[in-house]
Amino acid sequence: MEEPLLHAILGLVLLLSTRTDASAARSKKGPIKEVVMDMAPHSFDDQYQGCIDLMEAELQELNRTEFANETFAEGWRSATEEWQRRWGRVSSPMVLRQDQAIAVLAYTMEGELYRVFNNATLTAGRSRQHYLSSYPFKTLHFLLSRALHTLQESQTQPCHNVFRGVRGTRFTAQQGTVVRFGQFTSSSLQKKVAEFFGLDTFFSVETCYGVPIKDLSTFPGEDEVLIPPFEQFRVTNSTYTAGRSFIQLRSQGKSSTYNCEFVKEKRCKERPCAFSADKSSPLPRSPWPGWAPLAAPHSH
């Protein structure tokens, strides 16, 4: 076997071995869950258009309140420690602010946070009141949304072809329909990596709002691209063979039901606030050139 090929195989084995605990949990045999893909109508899909500064002004108090959620508090503490280990002593210019980078780290770390967060995001939009009173991840949702927006603006490649493998859930989708994942959705630029995570459903996706987070991820070898809840896709192919689903998706822009909901509740009771709530937008224009990986934030 040629040496470069051997190194590539050993690298993939090393990558997969880093997730032994998570993969073991995900590989437990059980009944396959059947899910029909749609527009995820109960998703909380806020893009915070027109209220970024107002939302950031609320973060300190909001974050303190949400630390009562132990899953969030523990995930955030671990991610903060990892950020300090990687970039705490470096003073190079940054792409993301410290809190946005920590949010991405927290999402990619082992543990329950990403799973609990995603499940909550899928249903937090069942009503505005449910989001306001029962969704304990408002801070994380906002910071992740802003992180992806910032990275998307700074990359040179507007769209990416990625893969997503799912174990334990068999998704079905009608060809020609428009669907959303409705949560922050992990995918990989490497097909082999995606296959490792499952083959009960396998997605091939063109995303124009998902962005590579390799330089921010706890597991950079996964070549992860993180897709936001509000991106919508056309189903271009959907097949079912030997108990497995294959679904091909092409980006169709973005669509949101909600906009600036937390700020509206906090600041707009006396008089209506005017935000630019672009409910549906086309694909992005060419992004800004000169994307650079996260180096290190300045000290705050």
Curated annotation (Swiss-Prot):
Residues 276-300 are annotated as: Disordered. Disulfide bonds join C51-C260, C159-C208. Residues 1-22 form the signal peptide. InterPro entries: ADP-ribosyltransferase_ARG, ART. It catalyses: L-arginyl-[protein] + NAD(+) = N(omega)-(ADP-D-ribosyl)-L-arginyl-[protein] + nicotinamide + H(+). One of its GO terms (molecular function) is NAD+ poly-ADP-ribosyltransferase activity. The active site is at R164, S186, E224. Keywords: Disulfide bond, Glycosyltransferase, NAD, NADP, Nucleotidyltransferase, Signal, Transferase. Gene3D superfamilies: Toxin ADP-ribosyltransferase, Chain A, domain 1. NAD(+) binds at Y107, R164, Q183, S217. Residues 70-256 form the TR mART core domain. It is an enzyme of class 2 (transferase). It comes from the Eukaryota. Its EC number is 2.4.2.31. Belongs to the Arg-specific ADP-ribosyltransferase family. This is Erythroblast NAD(P)(+)--arginine ADP-ribosyltransferase. It comes from Gallus gallus (Chicken). The gene is MADPRT.
